[in-house]
């Protein structure tokens, strides 16, 4: 943050600038020492994390890391303001995935794919407002092009979100698509999400348990493991009603009363896979010999046991 602020402070205004600034916070490992303004006895872990002594402590450490990130962003924004550049600058803050917690990061639940996206653009009505419409990270590039008056390359697949910046009630998408292939072990998943429903498909039927190496080590992971995480089952297909099941815990796939919805979403997902030539349709992604990939059964990503690693992918479902 200091280096980014220093660069802005030295900006001479002779030509437009682009500055990309990334932070380690809020990645694990979170700080062991909890900020004095955060009381671990009075924090509430977000769903799908249970409320317990262990998870509260873990989340308090996350909040300490998040506070550091907030202060760093504030340092940069304050420097823009001091230089008189705020009203001439497009500001975008985002993250790449959900919290590094079980059932969050490296999943296609909303707790895994729902991320922060803050955009402030000069003169836009939505500045300072929450916009509820669906947006994908694919939309960032065309949005910036429109805001800056730059011609959009023809290969872009995203949709400009400028209409949402002009009108917080505007919608630019009926659906978004998301995927997982690897974190440390192979776990191919695809989904389609609309405002009301989400349909998820797991493509590795050979292992329908939780890929534990794809979950970062933490007090929260320990809490789940002590209560049977290894025995938890994954569905090959899942359908969730995001209005009446915000936590995505009641799988509606296969229920006759939701058959029409499931069939329609599955067809839309299949069409997307064809249009994007997704390799999952032809057996998945092969692991090259030089890659280091955890076995699906491995419990920790940092295992020192050579038997916990593989160099081949087995048992993928093929879809047309």
Please name every model-derived segment:
Residues 29, 79-136, 302-308:
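Histidine-centered active-site microenvironments of extracellular/periplasmic hydrolases
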Residues 114, 228-236, 242-244, 252-320:
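Long, internal low-complexity/basic segments
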Residues 58-72, 107-115, 125-142, 148-160, ...:
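A short beta-strand-to-alpha-helix junction
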Residues 15-54, 197-227, 292-316:
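Core domains of carbohydrate- and sulfate-ester-processing enzymes
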Residues 1, 87-88, 128-194, 250, ...:
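Polar, surface-exposed loop/tail segments
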Residues 1-46, 81-90, 102, 175, ...:
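Active-site regions of oxyanion-processing enzymes, predominantly non-cytosolic
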Residues 99-101, 148-238, 293, 308, ...:
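C-terminal cap/loop subdomain of S1 sulfatases and analogous C-terminal strand-loop tails that border
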Residues 2-8, 44-89, 124, 147:
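A long, amphipathic alpha-helix that forms part
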């Amino acid at each position: 943050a200091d280096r980014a602020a220093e660069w802005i402070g030295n900006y001479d205004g002779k030509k437009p600038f682009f500055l990309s600034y990334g932070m380690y916070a809020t990645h694990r490992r979170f700080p062991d020492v909890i900020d004095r303004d955060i009381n671990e006895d009075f924090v509430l872990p977000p769903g799908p994390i249970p409320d317990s002594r262990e998870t509260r402590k873990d989340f308090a450490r996350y909040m300490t890391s998040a506070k550091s990130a907030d202060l760093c962003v504030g340092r940069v924004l304050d420097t823009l303001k001091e230089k008189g550049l705020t009203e001439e600058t497009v500001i975008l803050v985002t993250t790449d995935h959900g919290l590094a917690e079980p059932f969050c990061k490296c999943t296609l639940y909303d707790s895994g794919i729902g991320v922060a996206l803050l955009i402030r653009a000069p003169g836009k009505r939505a500045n300072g407002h929450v916009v509820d419409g669906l947006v994908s990270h694919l939309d960032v590039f065309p949005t910036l092009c429109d805001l800056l008056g730059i011609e959009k390359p023809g290969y872009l697949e995203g949709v400009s979100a400028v209409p949402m910046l002009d009108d917080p009630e505007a919608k630019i998408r009926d659906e978004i698509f998301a995927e997982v292939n690897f974190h440390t072990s192979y776990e191919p998943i695809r989904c389609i999400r609309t405002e009301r429903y989400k349909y998820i498909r797991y493509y590795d039927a050979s292992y329908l348990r939780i890929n534990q190496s794809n979950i970062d080590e933490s007090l929260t992971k320990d809490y789940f493991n002590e209560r049977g995480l290894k025995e938890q089952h994954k569905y090959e297909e899942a359908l969730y009603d995001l209005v009446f099941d915000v936590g995505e815990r009641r799988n509606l796939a296969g229920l006759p009363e939701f058959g029409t919805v499931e069939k329609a979403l599955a067809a839309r997902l299949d069409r997307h896979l064809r249009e994007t030539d997704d390799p999952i349709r032809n057996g998945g992604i092969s692991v090259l010999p030089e890659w280091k990939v955890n076995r699906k059964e491995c419990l920790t990503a940092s295992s020192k046991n050579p038997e916990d690693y593989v160099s081949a992918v087995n048992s993928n479902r093929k879809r047309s």
